[in-house]
């Protein structure tokens, strides 16, 4: 049965024209918080007045909403009981031996171009490239130079090789034009139909097409052409089973959109089934994955202790108690062993975001939310006195945790970041408050209003300000001054927003949440839900084209590690929301299985 979760149009130019007005709604510039229309504001004000009147009557109970969230799947005692033999020296020693063998492969002289591309591709997909970044860059630089000097000849008849070369170079920051695919296009401007029998070539071109930039029509055409024929391949009988699995996986989500750590676990199994498996790479991939998993488990134990001791979930029983899922976001963003302190900090940040989100979305009255927003904006512990009792535990736990993170940065780098953190957290709460006002007013925002607020309410500026502090040494004022409104942050926010809205919108609307982008566009365009979802997928693809501008990000004040983390947040969002809400609900078995494989289940030895 063919699978295609990503709606693909039949005509690239007509698609762009059809969606142009929606794409123009993607705002740019500093965050602003839109005001309601006069009528909507009057309605919201009346709603707030009603709440205030009710709160003044001590005997009157407030009718609060409920998210009906289940208890956590992984309890504190289970997490603390985790033991992992791969933390021992014997496995680290064996991994070091294997890494030396891989270095010899990378240093081999006169390696054929295709062999080089396949080796680098294997290392990247198996999650091993971080060990060999310097060697990989030198190897690709040498090959790139040789191509331009005419010492490497491209095979103009091998679609698989051409597309693999294009993808590996582009995803490593080298400028390769889409024109290299002109040799596979007929005089009428279409890809040669004879290529439809070359399934490996189609798969390679399909993956390459998702590294497209804005305006690259050839790659848009390649995506449509390959998607059509790969789906046809799945509809055939008696096909190669291993290739069939690879095609199915790619059509489910392209490699460019997959979180590297989660993809590595899947690809280890796929690679083991390959007839061209390299035993050294396979053994190293298995051992390294398990060693890193052992490190991640220690990080998880640490944040689990913090979450239990802060007692927020115990006191605020209406929130999502999801410390493992929060940690999964962190390893999806930065999995490398050396970033343990960043993962721990990000997990705490995600847990606090989840708490605050549930206060605004589910439990708080409009008056209470205005008080909480003011307290965060003032960043004053004395503001706790104005809050209702249930908010005080959450506010103080939040306030102390963020100040402690700022203190760590001051202690370790001598950089005072509390004002930067205060601003992004205050902006987040203001965006949440805007959504609450829309809800109480019964107001459906325009697409432009929604997106201008939603890229902030998705909390990515908060995540990435903390991530910057976690992966950058030394931090610099230039980067922090522009971070919360930089294009890389806005694009990352949109990727999360689109994935979140596509995955959780039905459940949240049932609960009584503010309309999401799908509903906003349905109302504005007068279209069906299916058509609206297709629009959102289009926006997601267009945003990835902006994210693919690696040469531009290289000129930014941010490190490659930070830019990768920004992309990875968008990738993890697709993992978490691909089959529904994998963060808040337990009804998404695929997300649960991915968490189990990444965090709790070692890869079986060869």
Curated annotation (Swiss-Prot):
Mg(2+) 3 binds at residues 500, 504, 508. GO terms for cellular component: chloroplast. The keyword Magnesium applies. GO terms for biological process: alpha-pinene biosynthetic process; diterpenoid biosynthetic process; limonene biosynthetic process; monoterpenoid metabolic process. A motif (DDXXD motif) lies at residues 357-361. (2E)-geranyl diphosphate binds at residues 320, 357, 361, 497, 500. Residues 1-38 form a transit peptide. Signal peptide: none annotated. Pfam families: Terpene_synth (PF01397), Terpene_synth_C (PF03936). Monomer. The Asp-Asp-Xaa-Xaa-Asp/Glu (DDXXD/E) motif is important for the catalytic activity, presumably through binding to Mg(2+). This is Limonene synthase, chloroplastic. It comes from Coffea arabica (Arabian coffee). The gene is TPS1.
């Amino acid at each position: 049965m063919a699978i295609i979760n990503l709606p693909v149009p039949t005509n690239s130019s007509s698609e762009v024209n059809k969606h142009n007005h929606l794409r123009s709604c993607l705002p740019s510039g500093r965050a602003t918080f839109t005001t309601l229309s006069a009528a909507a504001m009057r309605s919201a004000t009346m709603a707030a007045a009603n709440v205030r009147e009710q709160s003044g009557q001590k005997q009157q109970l407030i009718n609060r909403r409920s998210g009906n969230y289940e208890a956590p799947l992984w309890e504190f005692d289970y997490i603390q009981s985790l033991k992992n033999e791969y933390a021992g020296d014997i496995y680290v020693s064996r991994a070091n031996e294997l890494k030396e063998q891989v270095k010899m492969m990378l240093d081999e002289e006169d390696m054929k171009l295709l062999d080089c591309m396949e080796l680098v591709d294997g290392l990247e997909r198996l999650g091993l490239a971080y060990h060999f970044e310097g060697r990989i860059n030198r190897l690709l630089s040498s090959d790139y130079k040789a191509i331009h000097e005419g010492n490497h000849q491209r095979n103009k008849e091998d679609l698989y090789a051409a597309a693999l070369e294009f993808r590996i170079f582009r995803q490593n920051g080298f400028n390769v034009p889409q024109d290299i695919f002109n040799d596979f296009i007929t005089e009428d401007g279409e890809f040669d139909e004879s290529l439809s029998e070359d399934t490996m070539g189609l798969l390679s071109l399909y993956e390459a097409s998702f590294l497209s930039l804005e305006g690259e029509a050839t790659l848009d055409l390649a995506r449509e052409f390959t998607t059509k024929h790969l789906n046809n391949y799945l509809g055939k009988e008696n096909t190669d089973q291993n290739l069939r699995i690879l095609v199915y996986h790619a059509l489910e989500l392209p490699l460019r959109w997959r979180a590297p750590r989660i993809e590595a676990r899947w690809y280890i199994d796929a690679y083991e089934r390959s007839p061209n498996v390299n035993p050294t790479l396979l053994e190293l991939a298995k051992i390294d994955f398990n060693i890193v998993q052992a490190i991640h488990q220690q990080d998880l134990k640490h944040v689990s202790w913090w979450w239990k001791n802060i007692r927020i979930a115990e006191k605020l029983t209406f929130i999502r108690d999801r410390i493992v899922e929060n940690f999964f976001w962190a390893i999806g963003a930065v999995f490398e062993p050396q970033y343990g302190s960043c993962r721990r900090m990000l997990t705490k940040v995600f847990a606090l975001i989840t708490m605050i989100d549930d206060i605004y979305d589910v439990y708080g009255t409009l008056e209470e939310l205005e008080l909480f927003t003011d307290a965060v904006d003032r960043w004053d512990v004395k503001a706790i006195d104005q809050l209702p009792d249930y908010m005080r535990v959450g506010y103080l736990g939040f306030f102390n945790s963020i100040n402690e993170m700022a203190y760590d940065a001051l202690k370790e780098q001598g950089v005072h970041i509390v004002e930067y953190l205060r601003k992004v957290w205050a902006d987040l709460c203001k965006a949440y408050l805007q959504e609450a006002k829309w809800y109480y007013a019964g107001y459906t925002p325009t697409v432009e209003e929604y997106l201008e607020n939603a890229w902030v309410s998705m909390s990515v500026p908060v995540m990435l300000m903390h991530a910057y502090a976690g992966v950058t040494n030394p931090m610099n004022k230039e980067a922090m001054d522009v971070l919360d409104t930089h294009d890389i942050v806005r694009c990352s926010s949109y990727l999360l927003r689109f994935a979140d809205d596509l995955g959780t919108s039905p459940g949240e609307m049932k609960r009584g949440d503010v309309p999401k982008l799908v509903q906003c566009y349905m109302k504005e365009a007068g279209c069906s839900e299916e058509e609206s979802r297709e629009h959102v997928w289009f926006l997601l693809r267009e945003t990835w084209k902006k994210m693919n501008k690696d040469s531009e990000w290289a000129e930014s004040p941010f490190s490659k590690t930070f830019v990768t983390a920004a992309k990875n947040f968008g990738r993890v969002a697709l993992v978490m929301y691909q089959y529904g809400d994998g963060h808040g609900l337990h009804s998404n078995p695929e997300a649960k299985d991915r968490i189990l494989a990444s965090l709790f289940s070692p890869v079986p030895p060869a």
